[in-house]
A protein has these predicted regions:
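Charge-patterned, long linear interaction tracts outside catalytic cores
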Residues: 212-240
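Histidine- and/or cysteine-centered catalytic micro-motif in compact active-site loops
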Residues: 156-157, 224, 237-239, 263-266
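A short, flexible helix-boundary coil/loop motif
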Residues: 83-91, 104-108, 112-116, 164-223, ...
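Conserved, well-structured functional cores that handle cations and Mg-NTP chemistry
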Residues: 1-194, 202-212, 222
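Generic structural signal for hydrophobic core residues of well-folded globular domains
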Residues: 12, 80, 238, 250-253, ...
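Short amphipathic alpha-helical "interface-anchor" segments enriched in bulky aromatics
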Residues: 45, 243-274
């Protein structure tokens, strides 16, 4: 049976499309076979009314900056720090607070379980997970560490961090000394850190290996001092990364936000009115896959990325083909080719 959107809509997991495998192949077609990749994760609020939809509840909406009634999906994407782009891999619907309480789990525990579910395929792409400051907790770091992943994220501005002791051992009994004084963000010891040379950032950035009290481990720390005097703290639990790589990975993470924006605006991420979890799962992932196909097509056609222009182009091509099909005569191919190009490019605008 040939799968179409209609006959695949609502199929159970065992019979449905392997979205992760499909999107990985599209990502490799877009980025190439290899690159400096990381797994970006981000929960996103989906507006939904009613009471009977599976997992409906109250979730945080970043756009509204408040908790709202609806659904939430955990978006998993692949980012490339060289092309500074993102391809979506999978969407997984989140449980609501009542369902989590019955399972004696927190939302962070649930996010870890989602990564565990797809770990086999994700580890083939990267061992790095990039997420916002919400995920910079010991529970999440230890949870993904067991699955073979390291975290790149951002600390709160008041995070408790220490310089790492690098001196000789005393030879005394007991645990070796690991910390060598708290890092005072208002009075940095520049002799213990390295200044980063990055042309595309404003302000000054420094990097060092530090000890995090909250995470209870050593991290590669990047201290970004902005022109207004404020400091932002980025880190990686993989200390082999350079400070430049940590900052590049975290800044590229924001590309997943643009994927959510374009999927909501152009490929119907929020349009499904189904009340079945398999149909919702299909709709969410079909939306992201449609976005991936559009990105690959635009790249291979040599088009600048613009979902608005691409959607207009595809609509025009569809209408032109319908007109030609309905004409019922043998066309002049040279003339029709010229007319086809003229008509299909109508209403193309920049995003």
């Amino acid at each position: 049976m040939v799968l179409t959107y209609r006959n695949a809509f609502g199929l159970k997991k065992s019979k449905c499309i392997d979205w992760l495998k499909l999107n990985v192949s599209l990502a490799k077609r877009f980025f190439g076979k290899h690159g400096r990749w990381a797994i970006a994760i981000d929960p996103s609020y989906i507006s939904k009314a009613g009471k009977k939809t599976p997992h409906i509840g109250r979730f945080w909406s970043g756009c509204a900056q408040s908790v709202k009634h609806g659904l939430e999906i955990m978006g998993i994407g692949l980012i490339d720090i060289d092309t500074k782009d993102c391809m979506m891999l999978r969407a997984h619907q989140s449980l609501n607070n009542k369902e989590l309480s019955l399972r004696n789990k927190t939302m962070v525990d649930f996010y870890i379980s989602v990564i565990k579910r797809y770990r086999k395929e994700l580890l083939k792409l990267s061992t790095l997970i990039v997420a916002d400051a919400y995920f910079s907790t010991s529970t999440f770091v230890n949870g993904i560490k067991k699955e073979g992943f390291s975290l790149i994220s951002r600390f709160r501005d008041n995070a408790c961090l220490f310089y790492v002791y690098t001196g000789p051992r005393t030879g005394k009994r007991g645990r070796p000394k690991t910390k060598d004084g708290k890092i005072d963000m208002k009075n940095l010891d520049l002799t213990r850190m390295e200044k980063m040379e990055m042309k595309d950032i404003e302000g000054t950035a420094y990097t060092l290996i530090a000890y995090s009290k909250a995470l209870k481990c050593k991290v590669r720390l990047v201290i970004w001092q902005m022109p207004n005097g404020k400091k932002k703290l980025f880190f990686s639990t993989d200390t082999s990364l350079s400070g430049e790589e940590v900052l590049l990975y975290y800044r590229t993470r924001f590309q997943i936000e643009f994927c959510f924006r374009d999927a909501k605006g152009y490929t119907g991420l929020m349009d499904c009115q189904a009340r079945d979890k398999w149909k919702l799962d299909f709709a969410f992932n079909a939306s992201f896959t449609s976005l991936n196909v559009a990105k690959v097509t635009m790249k291979e056609m040599g088009m600048e990325y613009s979902m608005s222009s691409f959607k207009s182009l595809m609509t025009n091509i569809y209408l032109v083909r319908r007109i030609f099909k309905a004409c019922g005569y043998i066309p002049n191919r040279t003339l029709i080719s010229k007319i086809f190009k003229d008509l299909s490019c109508l209403q193309r605008i920049a995003a």
